Amino acid sequence: MQIEITRRSLLAGVIYGALANFIGSSSKSYAAQELNIILGRPTSNSIALNLITSNSMSCYIEYGTTGRTFPQKSAILQLSAATPTVFELKSLKPNQKYFYRVRFKASGAATYSISKSYNFQTARTPGKSFAFSLHGDTHPERAGKMFNSELYYVAMANVAAQGNDFHILMGDDFSIDPLIAKGQANKENVEKIYRTHRDWLGTIGATTPVFLVNGNHEQAAQYLLDGSLTNPAVLAGNARNKFYPQPAPDAFYTGDNLDVPGIGKLRDYYSWHWGDALFITLDPYWHSKYAVDNVAGVSVEDNANNKKNGGGASKVSDLWQVGIGDEQYAWFKKTLETTKAKYIFVFTHHVMGTGRGAIEVSENYEWGGKDPKGVTTFAAQRPNWELPIHDLMVKHKVSILFQGHDHIFVTQQRDGLIYQSMPNPADDTFSMFNESAYKSGVKAPNSGHVRVQVGADEAKVEYFLAARAKDTSRKNMQVAHSYSVKPRMV
């Protein structure tokens, strides 16, 4: 793999105002009814539109390819106030930009009112250039420590202005740990966590489909399952799928076929092709019988002592006991073996799902095959696996492994594989958390998002900073670091 890395510092852009999605008002409509849209699971011929309205009403979606006429219509659905409803837009064309509007009316209204026009992109065909974006851990529950709401709106407005085909969140965006610690992890409170995040993601969600990667603080994890339908893992899994349309295996996506009682399909790991690239997400949390990272509702000190709280099993020190599991590994291996894509991008919350650093810990356990003493015990510990995860990715020339968890931007490389650690989008302390865990690489402080432009000759990665007017030490949309990755040889 050929990699070109260059530093850039472009002072450009201004702070974009937070973009709220509101229905336009008219003499025949209500005054500015709020409309919150999250697009998801786009394919070459369909897309899901998850809609929340502030009042109960009947709605349908009209759409077309010109922005002037909207000849295609969805089914008319009855929406209850503040309740997410999914519209499936079908019979679409691949590699096509679509424009759409929401038509809505309350009970007793004579005619349907019309929202403003939005747009989305169906799956690109091979040879077509495109861009996608992503950001690391949001942690809205850590306001004042590594999260600021105003700054998050700025970061999302920056993403919206770029018009990327889709956006990926890297996990720890819907933490329910505080609820579990207080004994308040019920359905209403867990769903509120997922609903509230749409206030920020609504800035991009009407035009940019959102993909989610599972993180440790979501506590959507196997170790918490206890047979009840009210345990935190089931509540988190259901809330995720209720408010964010994520992929399940079909003709376009491959992924987790497991059905969990009370949830159904987890939609936690999946893959898809888009243009010249293959995208793969991984998840160790739903496939480990023990806590991979922090135990739900337990402090850092108690975690160190392996104490249990909030249900489920305690955290283990032997990380051979946790991981992605045989089924997910076999799927991952097959997905890598069968692709002809020029680029492969893999997304996971963190190497092994826990710890700090990237290449520094990539030689350990199922990721690299060694135990803490540096002895290779892979064959005994994973007898059904061909290679450790890192070696499997190197064999198949994965372009970039993206991870979150560490709250810092770092670009590293091992064996020709780039490890890209992702920054927080809205940390107003602009810190480089866990910097000491990274012994090498290009480092940059929070906050902002990463954009990847994928073309026939290279994929260009850029880290865009987010800044408010009062953040005079930085410029909004300044490029803190950029590099290019060449296509893999297949």
Go through each PLM region and give its residues.
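C-terminal segment of classical bacterial N-terminal signal peptides
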Residues: 20-28
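N-terminal secretory signal peptides and thylakoid transit peptides that target proteins
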Residues: 1-18
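General helical secondary-structure elements
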Residues: 3-4, 24, 37, 236
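Metal-dependent phosphoester/phosphodiester hydrolase catalytic core
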Residues: 30-433, 442-443, 451-490
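Generic low-complexity, intrinsically disordered sequence content enriched
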Residues: 14-15, 23, 93-96
